[in-house]
Amino acid sequence: MSEWIEIGKIVAPQGLKGDLRVYPSSDFPERFTEPGKRWLLSPGQVEPISIELLSGRYVPGKGLYVIELAGIKSRQQAEALRNSQLLIEKGDRPQLEADEFYVPDLIGLTVINQLNGKTIGKVINIIFAGNDLLEVEKISTDTPVISEVVENNLPSKSKRSRDTKNQKKNQSPPSKKILIPFVKEIVPIVNFEQSIIEITPPDGLIDL
């Protein structure tokens, strides 16, 4: 899937004539309003299929688009596409301005506190709000036996204790998540070459 970029997800039918509600993961309205070829990946599919976008409109207050796809004429057909992804080819991405980023490129970057050089965690999601927020999973300082997880290539939650009486004691603590405003004052550096984001957090932000 590295050659594809998700631009939205079909969340529900709209009406009775095959229209679809799409929650966007792209900031470019033309992805949903300008007719042309798109790609569709339904749950369970390995490869996307080509589809034709006929029209689309933004729904104020809902944060989503209603689109019409060629060949989808009934609510039943639309329902069958629920949870499908709308995609574009990676090469179709427009050139961005300075300090603009594509969401998929930010996921997985390591977040570092510029003030002390310590690693905070990894970006796991972007939350779209008045100011966009980086959702960061903090690195736990209490995670036991990290080398064991790496050697077995299994996440810690998949490892089971043979001693059922000690199972709860040996479990890793749940990961903590924090939200970091994605603004220049707090996130001055995004370095894709090193796969890091440097932040200058205000007091208390990373302790929440």
UniProtKB/Swiss-Prot annotation:
GO cellular component, one term: cytoplasm
Molecular functions (GO terms): ribosome binding
Record has Acyltransferase as a keyword: no
Cysteine disulfide partners in this protein: none
Location in or out of the cell: Cytoplasm
Annotated region described as Disordered, given as residue ranges: 154-174
Annotated ranges, domain PRC barrel: 98-205
Keyword vocabulary terms for this entry: Chaperone, Cytoplasm, Ribosome biogenesis, rRNA processing
SUPFAM superfamilies the record matches: PRC-barrel domain, Translation proteins
UniProt record, GO biological process: ribosomal small subunit biogenesis; rRNA processing
Calcium is among the record's keywords: no
Pfam family, any one: RimM
Lineage: superkingdom: Bacteria
Function: An accessory protein needed during the final step in the assembly of 30S ribosomal subunit, possibly for assembly of the head region. Essential for efficient processing of 16S rRNA. May be needed both before and after RbfA during the maturation of 16S rRNA. It has affinity for free ribosomal 30S subunits but not for 70S ribosomes.
Domains: entry comment: The PRC barrel domain binds ribosomal protein uS19.
Family: Belongs to the RimM family.
PANTHER family associated with the record: RIBOSOME MATURATION FACTOR RIMM
Record's subunit section: Binds ribosomal protein uS19.
Protein name as annotated: Ribosome maturation factor RimM
Species this chain originates from: Trichodesmium erythraeum (strain IMS101)
UniProt gene name: rimM
